[in-house]
């Protein structure tokens, strides 16, 4: 069973799927109001206990067994992460990794010492030869660790943690 979990401003949403011959089949989906609708999910300021209980209740309500989840995918909200598309020179993957760290510090407004940086190559640039389009993503280690801790305390093992604005794209690649 593959499970997607979205911790939103008003609802916690979950969808469970099984892989079938031609793709995926949704086997269950549900949502639950957040513990306190006046308190948006902020990893630095939340009362973890209430959020853990809400996630556990949603999983129980949907009759999902955390032990049967093969892959858990979840996202960090756009307000807790930065996303930027850039164009850069095409280069070997080893060089690209260090170049992306440099580019992220240049383009994404975050303290580089506390940032977790990732990137995804979109493909060749249509307008410039020998250049590629890349999406840079960054969040703080604190945000990422809070998200992982929340999932672990809820009895879930995170497999994929994405950034909400690009999660849907990555779900199908």
At which residue positions do the language-model features occur?
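Conserved NTP-handling cores and scaffolds of large molecular machines
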Residues: 19-21, 59-66, 108-112, 172
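Gly/Thr-rich phosphate-binding beta-strand-loop-beta motif of the actin/hexokinase/Hsp70
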Residues: 1-33, 70-75, 173
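N-terminal phosphate-binding loop and adjacent alpha-helix
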Residues: 29-62
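Phosphate/pyrophosphate-binding loops at sites that engage ATP/ADP/AMP, CoA/4′-phosphopantetheine
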Residues: 55-71, 154
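Short, solvent-exposed coil/turn elements at secondary-structure transition points
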Residues: 20, 32-38, 123, 164-166
């Amino acid at each position: 069973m593959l499970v997607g979990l979205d911790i939103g401003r008003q609802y916690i949403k979950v969808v469970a799927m099984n892989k079938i011959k031609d793709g995926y089949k949704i086997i269950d989906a549900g949502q639950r109001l957040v513990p306190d609708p006046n308190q948006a999910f902020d990893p630095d300021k939340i009362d973890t206990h209430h959020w853990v209980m809400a996630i556990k209740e949603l999983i129980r309500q949907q009759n999902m067994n955390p032990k049967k989840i093969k892959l858990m995918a979840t996202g960090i909200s756009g307000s807790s992460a930065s996303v930027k598309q850039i164009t850069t020179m095409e280069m070997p993957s080893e060089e690209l990794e260090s170049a992306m760290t440099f580019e992220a510090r240049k383009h994404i407004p975050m303290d580089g010492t506390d940032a977790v940086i990732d990137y995804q190559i979109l493909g060749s640039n249509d307008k410039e030869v020998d250049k590629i389009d890349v999406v840079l993503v960054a969040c703080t280690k604190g945000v990422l660790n809070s998200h992982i801790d929340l999932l672990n305390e809820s009895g879930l093992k995170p497999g994929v943690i994405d950034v909400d604005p690009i999660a849907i794209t990555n779900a199908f690649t």
